[in-house]
Amino acid sequence: MLANYFGSVRFVYNHFLAKRKEQYEQTRKSSNYYEQAKELTAMKKTEAFSWLKEINSQTLQHALRHLETAYVNFFKGRTRFPRFHSKKHGGSFAVPQHFKVEGNRIFIPKFKGGIRFAKSQDVLGELRNMTVSVTPGGKYYVCIMAQSMPTLRLVFSKSPTSTCAMMQT
């Protein structure tokens, strides 16, 4: 099932990169993220691409965001033109929401059952984003981003007429 996620994300990225490239060569303009996200939704409803429904929609949309960032960076002169992703260089996919970590298992939307992983440290705070990557050698890694809550302490200030409490981080 993980291979389906990696393959689907790579397919979406490459498919829409090819469309953008072709569009730009013909009209000197290309569609943006929002137009391509609408097209992706319509594409998933067709018989030929119904297999994309098996993958979390936000994961596929994140691939489009990644492509949008690559395009913007290219046109701002920060990097070279976006390249097609291949199987042999590994890959990654992001799960921006609705995943859970319970013990040493990760639960991803539309993924049957949890995925066991070796936890190097406890995940503290509110879960924000998760990226699963694979190396060309076949090793899998997961990076979980969590927002920790700041520690607050009360500081009291006394004046002759009143007492005031302030919170500091």
Please report, for each region that a protein language model flagged, where it lies by residue.
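Nucleic-acid substrate recognition interfaces
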Residues: M1-T169
